[in-house]
Amino acid sequence: MIDRYKHQQLRIGLVSPQQISAWATKKIPNGEIVGEVTKPYTFHYKTNKPEKDGLFCERIFGPIKSGICACGNYRVIGDEKEDPKFCEQCGVEFVDSRIRRYQMGYIKLTCPVTHVWYLKRLPSYIANLLDKPLKELEGLVYCDFSFARPITKKPTFLRLRGSFEYEIQSWKYSIPLFFTTQGFDIFRNREISTGAGAIREQLADLDLRIIIENSLVEWKQLGEEGPTGNEWEDRKIVRRKDFLVRRMELAKHFIRTNIEPEWMVLCLLPVLPPELRPIIQIEGGKLMSSDINELYRRVIYRNNTLTDLLTTSRSTPGELVMCQEKLVQEAVDTLLDNGIRGQPMRDGHNKVYKSFSDVIEGKEGRFRETLLGKRVDYSGRSVIVVGPSLSLHRCGLPREIAIELFQTFVIRGLIRQHLASNIGVAKSQIREKKPIVWEILQEVMQGHPVLLNRAPTLHRLGIQSFQPILVEGRTICLHPLVCKGFNADFDGDQMAVHVPLSLEAQAEARLLMFSHMNLLSPAIGDPISVPTQDMLIGLYVLTSGTRRGICANRYNPCNRKNDKNEKLYETNYKYMKEPFFCNSYDAIGAYRQKRINLDSPLWLRWQLDQRVIASREVPIEVHYESFGNYHEIYAHYLIVRSVKKETFCIYIRTTAGHISFYREIEEAIQGFSQACSYDT
């Protein structure tokens, strides 16, 4: 369907019997209305042609071959001069055979049938609206018991007997005996109701607004009572309140979408277009049919049997009619969702039939495999690896993938620059991988974002746009900070690459979908671009350090190699002296020269105006020099003072990893501040 904004969309929900009839029926030029499937047959075994009014009828679903009717006559499609537009003998219209992909039919059910999705699936919508136990409703649907209709004010048989209680077994089994007597049809139809028809009557009598009001009043009363002191009773109250909330939400949804509750009980059963449930001829002349065809045949057989029982014989036992209605209900249940009521239906080879639910749900269903997961043009797929040198909004595309995705744009660039005379010459240059091809590819990629998608796409951050750059290898490089939005890691995960073609798609990718514009979670507002997994381990290793305490800074005669910052294995003093550095650049330079390790503790001189020591902490040790100056050594810093107790300088105890991490954070903050100043 197409909404008012011209967006194509698909909506799955309840529809009225009138809407089903409008979808499935059509009026042929002679005025006859067709669409009802009344026969369970598919193809005639002799002529190999579809049976009339069967599951593949050409009158209902359209011709198998375009412009050719069931009689074999041919008409030119779209030729207004050709008259008539349908065959008067077989009633088949001369139209395109593609109509068999979307033209539906319907089965007129003799008795109402509940939709098993709304009865058996949890939560049961029918049970929620009627506020009755699911077990009781199932017994009513499958004709295990009946209920009395509160009809007229006249003294009826059941009123004289009292209200009907199905728990009384003798009374329950005595009712069918009256049905076997001729003339009790009026009594049966007037005073009791069973099967899906009983559910339909109760749903039709519901007033959704009154349901909302009554549920709200009851919810408030339960909230005012407070805890009873009995844990079991308190749990029952909580469950009841949750149920009332679900019931109100369901009623509001029905009102908002203009859906009537009785539509959950089917009177007309839609029949899928035949091209969606085909019969294919394989080698040896054998036929391979879709399971749905067999399930449809089962429904039609049982429905026709029930029709014969009600029309051909006036003295049919009522119990037999009820059993046949139950069989029709079970056949429709199997068609919609095989196995939902217990053991699934199997064929002669003990293979479970695939019902309508099996066709559309799951990874191999119609939606995820054919509609959502189908292969599209201008897309690729590869394994992702970490790209720590990338910017947040960039991704690395392998040359092999990039040249295929942007081949059309590269061909246009070669022709525009007069480097190729036609498309064939341009493709040959691309196959030869000439240097000019990579230069044009770089220019094209600079102005064209790509979309990365990791399945399953559970929220909008599952698809984000990036600025691609060429990388060597055959894997896609990704910044590790964007992994949380994709729920991805680098243990073999794959991602799909898509190229937005239209200007609208490119604008949306640049303005809304770039990774550096999606830093917060759309669900809860928390930061989504946070370090995870590999980055957390790297930050831990970078800032862990070797915890040796201040004893390594002591001077002792046995530690002869302290000035070289080396370990001494020949004595018990195994640790080296912690070096002093005037600034962070000297410390990083010493690390790059491999004079210290990444986790080696060191003393870094800190500016006095940047750090104020106002702690009352007592120094662990005090080292005095020959001129009277002394060092106050604390757990994480060191203060150099003069004889007059003036502070010369302060050293903090850190590692080269801490310094490197601090400088990265400082540069990021400075860059952010500059960007904010430019904006203002």
Swiss-Prot record:
| Gene Ontology MF terms in the entry | DNA binding; DNA-directed RNA polymerase activity; magnesium ion binding; zinc ion binding
Q: Per its Swiss-Prot or TrEMBL entry, what cofactor is needed?
A: Mg(2+); Zn(2+)
Q: Which GO terms describe its cellular component?
A: chloroplast; DNA-directed RNA polymerase complex; mitochondrion
By its UniProt entry, which InterPro entries does this protein fall under? DNA-dir_RpoC_beta_prime, RNA_pol_asu, RNA_pol_N, RNA_pol_Rpb1_1, RNA_pol_Rpb1_3_sf, RNA_pol_Rpb1_clamp_domain, RNApol_RpoC1
GO BP annotations, alphabetical order: DNA-templated transcription
Where is this chain primarily localised? plastid
Catalysis performed (reactions) = RNA(n) + a ribonucleoside 5'-triphosphate = RNA(n+1) + diphosphate
Superkingdom to which the source organism belongs: Eukaryota
Give me the residues that bind Mg(2+), please.
D489, D491, D493
The broad enzyme category this protein falls into is: transferase
Cofactor binding mode and count? Binds 1 Mg(2+) ion per subunit.
Binding-site residues, Zn(2+): C69, C71, C87, C90
**Sorted UniProt keywords:** Chloroplast, DNA-directed RNA polymerase, Magnesium, Metal-binding, Nucleotidyltransferase, Plastid, Transcription, Transferase, Zinc
Location(s), subcellular:
Plastid, Chloroplast
Q: Which Gene3D superfamilies match?
A: 1.10.40.90, 2.40.40.20, RNA polymerase II, clamp domain (4.10.860.120), RNA polymerase Rpb1, domain 3 (1.10.274.100)
Cite the EC number: 2.7.7.6
Its assembly, as annotated, is: In plastids the minimal PEP RNA polymerase catalytic core is composed of four subunits: alpha, beta, beta', and beta''. When a (nuclear-encoded) sigma factor is associated with the core the holoenzyme is formed, which can initiate transcription.
Q: Which HAMAP family match?
A: RNApol_bact_RpoC1
State the similarity comment: Belongs to the RNA polymerase beta' chain family. RpoC1 subfamily.
User: Function of this protein?
Assistant: DNA-dependent RNA polymerase catalyzes the transcription of DNA into RNA using the four ribonucleoside triphosphates as substrates.
The protein depicted here goes by the name: DNA-directed RNA polymerase subunit beta'
Gene name linked to the record: rpoC1
